[in-house]
């Protein structure tokens, strides 16, 4: 019986479920496996890891040799944390990744091509857009504003040029002739309406004018002469139309009837009309034509 109790106590002490053993096992935890073990070699080139509890978190520390790494380390170190870089570093990484993608073959894994991972992760895109520096936004707005200002200036210049071109019309020069020149030109025009080239040249030389001035004067004088002829012809037509409205009115006489002549004495002469006209009278007024001239009885 005592041997049995001793064996039971010894087995209880050696049991892993004993309180002391459980406390000892809790005080000495086993070393956890690192979560980021496959990518630790690539992450050491860009930033180090800090351990908080049992989870490893990256510390955002960029070494000075960060921008001098080759393209492979550039892609391997920043393919899953694109938002850890600043705007300038992100631009540098994008240019290096573009060059590496152009030089590498088209076939490859997702780890070798960071662009595929970035495209498939919308959260990474949002973080990347949020972490853009304010300098980039200001520069973009400034560029657009400058472009708008330049475009506005060009439009304003074009509108001014168009406004200047519209009223720009060549003014006609007006030649002032002296009295002697006008008299000589009028006398020549009365003799001849049209001049030959030699006559025009001689007249221009005698009047100290150019041939163009003499030619223009004769053209204007012929137009004036034609207008005068048209006005005279119109006046003649009006007078002819007025003459056509004149109506011929004959003079009417009332002869003595036979009964009156028989009743009167033979010695009494017959009364003659007071007014006698050897030829008919013309009246131009229409009212007078309707009233005949009667002899008093």
Swiss-Prot record:
Residues spanning the signal sequence: none
GO (cellular component) term, any one: nucleus
Subcellular location: Nucleus
Induction notes from the record: Regulated by fgf3 and fgf8 in otic vesicle.
Cysteine pairings via disulfide bonds: none
DNA-binding region, residues: 170-229
A Gene Ontology biological process term: posterior lateral line development
Pfam families registered for this protein in UniProt: Homeodomain
Entry GO MF terms: DNA-binding transcription factor activity, RNA polymerase II-specific; RNA polymerase II transcription regulatory region sequence-specific DNA binding
Entry's transmembrane regions: none
Domain of life: Eukaryota
CDD domains: homeodomain
Keyword Cell cycle: no
Tissue localization of expression: Expressed in the ear placode and vesicle and in cells forming the vestibulo-acoustic ganglion. Also expressed in the lateral line.
Protein keywords: Developmental protein, Differentiation, DNA-binding, Homeobox, Neurogenesis, Nucleus, Transcription, Transcription regulation
The family this protein is said to belong to: Belongs to the HMX homeobox family.
Protein's name according to its UniProt entry: Homeobox protein HMX3
Lineage of origin: Eukaryota, Metazoa, Chordata, Craniata, Vertebrata
């Amino acid at each position: 019986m005592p041997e049995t109790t001793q064996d039971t106590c010894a087995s209880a002490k050696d049991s892993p479920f004993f309180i002391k053993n459980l406390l000892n096992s809790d005080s000495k935890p086993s070393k956890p496996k690192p979560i980021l073990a496959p990518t630790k070699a690539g992450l050491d080139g860009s930033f180090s890891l800090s351990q908080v509890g049992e989870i490893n978190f990256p510390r955002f520390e960029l070494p000075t040799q960060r921008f001098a790494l080759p393209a492979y380390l550039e892609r391997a170190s920043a393919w899953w944390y694109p938002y850890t870089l600043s705007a300038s570093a992100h631009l540098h990484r994008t240019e290096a990744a573009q060059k590496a993608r152009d030089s590498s073959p088209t076939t490859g894994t997702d780890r070798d091509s960071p662009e595929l991972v970035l495209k498939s992760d919308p959260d990474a895109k949002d973080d990347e857009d949020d972490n853009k520096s304010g300098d980039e936004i200001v520069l973009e707005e400034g560029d657009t504003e400058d472009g708008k200002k330049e475009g506005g200036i060009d439009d304003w210049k074009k509108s001014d040029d168009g406004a200047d071109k519209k009223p720009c019309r060549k003014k006609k020069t007006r030649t002032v002739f002296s009295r002697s020149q006008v008299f000589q030109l009028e006398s020549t025009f009365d003799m001849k309406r049209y001049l030959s080239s030699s006559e025009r040249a001689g007249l221009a030389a005698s009047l100290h004018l150019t041939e163009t001035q003499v030619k223009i004067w004769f053209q204007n004088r012929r137009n004036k002469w034609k207008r005068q002829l048209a006005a005279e012809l119109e006046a003649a037509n009006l007078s002819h139309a007025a003459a056509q409205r004149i109506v011929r009115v004959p003079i009417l006489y009332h002869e003595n009837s036979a009964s009156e002549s028989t009743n009167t004495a033979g010695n009494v002469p017959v009364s003659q009309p007071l007014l006698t006209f050897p030829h008919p009278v013309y009246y131009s007024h229409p009212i007078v034509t309707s009233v005949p001239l009667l002899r008093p009885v």
